[in-house]
Amino acid sequence: PYVDAESIRYLRFPGGSTNTVSHRYGGNGIMKALKAQAEDKGYHWIDWNVCAEDATASHPDAAQILRNIRRDADGQDTCVVLLHDTKATGQTVKALPDMIAYFREQGYNFCTVAQMDALQCETK
C-alpha cells in the first residue's frame, strides 16, 4: 500500500541526527535547528544504534553484514538497525533471515517505529 504525505510522521535524518557532514553546509547548529523544525511540524525523528554497514563502498557479503550487526547490537537493550534497500545492497536481503534469528535468540522483540515511539514495545 502507498502512504500519502499527510500520514508520514517519522523521519530519519540522512547520516543521523548528530551527523557532522551537515555542519559543513549549515554550520554548527544546523542539526539542532532541523530537529526543532521537524518536531514543530509534528514529525518524530528516529536514529539507529546498530549499523549493518551494507551501503559502504566495500559491498559486504551477507556474513559480514551479520557480523556488523552482532558487533553493534552487543550490550544494547534496544536496537534500531540501519539497513538499506537498493539494487547495490542485495546482500542485505540475504542476511535478513540470519539477522532475525540472531535477534530472536538474544531475546529481542520486534516492533514498529510507532510502537517504539509510544513505548509500547518491550525492550530485551
Predicted regions: what is each one?
Residues 1-82, 86-109, 115-123:
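Catalytic domains of cell-wall/extracellular-matrix polysaccharide-remodeling enzymes
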